[in-house]
């Protein structure tokens, strides 16, 4: 299940943590944009998402500043390719920024002409996996047209991180449900699948019913603060297994320090928290 990525190491001084945390922290789910378009991109995305506030400037440098201040040891950029033909430029930009502590996934669009070629390029560039967003990319994870992507990622041992559940910037019906991710994991048992937003944003009852216990990872991004019943978070973690839950923020849409505090304040054991904040990501990406 876990892949090896040689050559990753902790940067000097990054092991230092703030007083409220004695744990190493890796954020598997952040977003950055080129400096020239970061401000306009955040303004556009916020406007279409009920004026959702942002907590960084959306640039690599500002994310680094906030992350180190909050005690993070590392973080993952998750670019979304929103149009066919963009993958080459997006992935080249991401690869230029894929250096510890700031790692990066790559991206592919379901309508790209050479899907397998794009996925191979992501591997050849040394990127850490592939990010997908069924709403922004308008596809369902079980559609036959994306099957070659899953097959190739499984073959090349590239983890995939997929948006889960509803999206504040879109209207229903949504493209994929927790049961679809469960089926995807059944079809591709060797594929490392990470479902964002604890398996399905605002679909957490369905996550408990259809996805908990399956061969997938769940990330915590943009989830806990929206859950009316906080005990459901703990219940999902315990039933699914803390060894299959990864810490994420969806930065710039969540304050980095607050996100750590939200998760660390839950009634989980120290070992469970260490798995979520660091150990599980370290096993996947071998750092």
Model-derived features with residue positions:
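Active-site neighborhood of phospho(di)ester-bond hydrolases with catalytic His/Asp-centered motifs
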Residues: 25-28, 78, 105-106, 131, ...
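Active-site environment of divalent metal-dependent phosphoester hydrolases
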Residues: 33-36, 82-85, 111-114, 137, ...
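Mid-to-C-terminal alpha-helical segments outside catalytic/metal-binding sites
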Residues: 4-7, 19-31, 35-70, 74, ...
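Active-site gating/metal-coordination segments in enzymes
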Residues: 20, 73-74, 84-168, 172-175
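A general structural detector for well-ordered alpha-helical segments in enzyme core domains, enriched
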Residues: 62-66, 90-97, 117-122, 145-149, ...
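Catalytic pocket-lining loop regions of alpha/beta-barrel enzymes
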Residues: 128-129, 142-246
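Conserved, mostly hydrophobic/aromatic
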Residues: 29, 94, 130, 153, ...
């Amino acid at each position: 299940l876990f892949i090896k990525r040689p050559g990753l190491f902790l940067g000097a001084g990054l092991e230092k943590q703030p007083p409220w945390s004695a744990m190493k922290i890796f954020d598997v789910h952040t977003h950055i944009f080129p400096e020239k378009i970061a401000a306009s991109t955040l303004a556009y995305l916020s406007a279409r998402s009920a004026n959702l506030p942002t907590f960084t400037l959306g640039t690599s440098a500002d994310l680094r500043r906030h992350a180190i201040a909050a005690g993070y040891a590392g973080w993952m950029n998750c670019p979304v390719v929103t149009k066919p033909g963009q993958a080459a430029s997006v992935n080249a930009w991401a690869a230029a920024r894929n250096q510890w502590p700031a790692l990066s996934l790559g991206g592919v669009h379901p309508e790209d002409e050479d899907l397998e070629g794009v996925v191979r390029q992501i591997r050849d560039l040394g990127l850490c996996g592939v990010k997908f967003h069924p709403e922004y990319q308008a596809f369902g994870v079980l559609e036959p047209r994306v099957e070659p992507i899953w097959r190739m990622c499984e073959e090349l041992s590239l983890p995939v991180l997929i948006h889960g559940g509803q999206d504040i910037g879109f209207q229903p019906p949504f493209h994929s449900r927790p049961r679809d991710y469960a089926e995807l994991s059944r079809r591709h048992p060797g594929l490392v699948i990470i479902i964002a937003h604890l398996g399905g944003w605002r679909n957490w009852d369905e996550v408990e019913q259809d996805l908990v216990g399956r061969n997938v990872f769940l990330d915590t991004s943009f989830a806990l603060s929206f859950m009316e019943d906080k005990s459901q978070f703990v219940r999902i973690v315990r039933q699914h297994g803390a060894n299959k839950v990864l810490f994420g923020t969806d930065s710039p849409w969540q304050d980095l320090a607050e996100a750590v505090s939200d998760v660390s304040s839950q009634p989980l054991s120290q070992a469970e928290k260490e798995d979520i904040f660091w150990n599980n990501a370290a096993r996947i990406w071998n750092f």
